[in-house]
Amino acid sequence: MTSDPEELFDLDADRPDLSGAVLLHTLDGFVDAGAAVRLARATLLAGDAPIVARFDVDQLHDYRARRPVMHFDVDHWSDYDTPQLAVHLLHDQDETPFLLLAGPEPDALWERFTAAVALLVERLGVRMVVGLDAFPMSVPHTRPTPIIVHGSRRELFADYRAWLGQIMVPASAGHLIEYRLGAAGIDTLGIAAPVPPYLAQAEFPTAALALLREVGARTGLRLDVSSLEDVDSGTREAIDREVSASEELTALVAALERQYDTAAAAARTAIADGDLPSADELGAELERFLAEQSRGE
């Protein structure tokens, strides 16, 4: 095993000039309430997505903790789903190139992996690195998703009104990328979508849409989200039917709506200072969600 971060990845020598591109990262393995990050990633990868860099998964992946799938066909093994951690080249609706780091979150060597990402950013001339998150929070599905933005320089999101104070949550490799690269002078952003707690284990494309729209607003990319909009419309109708069929859910949603509307009216924005969960409450919700995921595995 090498200690040189450059040995953790292979970079395509035939890649085009990507100077000034944005790098998004959506690693599997951390909190993804409502599968919002997975849905956003799938939307981005739906078209042509050639790989420009591959990471050495054998050094980073714990195969016994997250076992890959093998396929058996009658009397022989027919296929193996090899874990892949790679940087894909994508284009927006204006044919502007951007990059997406996707795959399993490393189980080991986080610092070396983060240093390797920093090297890639330097080699490729990336101008900004953006990570996506989705976490459970006491908001209703019937109101706009109150996106949370954070980053290395306040100038990157000067129009955003921060409402969280100090908070401690379980770390992720994606968060470490934002922290280490930001400390090194690289522009980094994190965009997070709160998801209603009653939808945390389901698919909630509304949150995925909110993430991608915020990416566009912060980076200037014109992302095609039309397919996700179609899915979201049908999903919201199904959620509304399920809620209306349950007195308990109906009461919960109504209570969350009152809380949300009171907060929004007080601050004239989707996120206000008094009535949403405190940092401690949010941290507790994240801990509970992670514990539920671990039990599910």
Task: Locate the predicted segments by residue.
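N-terminal short beta-loop-beta anion/metal-coordinating cradle
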Residues: 2-103
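Conserved active-site and cofactor/substrate-binding residues in soluble primary-metabolism enzymes
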Residues: 35-39, 108, 112, 172, ...
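Predominant activation on well-ordered alpha-helical scaffold segments within soluble catalytic domains
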Residues: 38-45, 118, 174-178, 182, ...
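Hydrophobic/aromatic beta-strand patches that form the interior of the parallel beta-sheet core
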Residues: 53, 99-101, 130, 187-192
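Internal, conserved structured core segments that host functional sites
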Residues: 96, 104-155, 177
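Short acidic, glycine/Ser/Thr-rich loop/turn "cap" segments at secondary-structure junctions
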Residues: 99-104, 159-163
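Catalytic cores of processing enzymes, dominated by hydrolases/peptidases
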Residues: 138-218, 222
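A conserved C-terminal secondary-structure "cap"
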Residues: 199-297
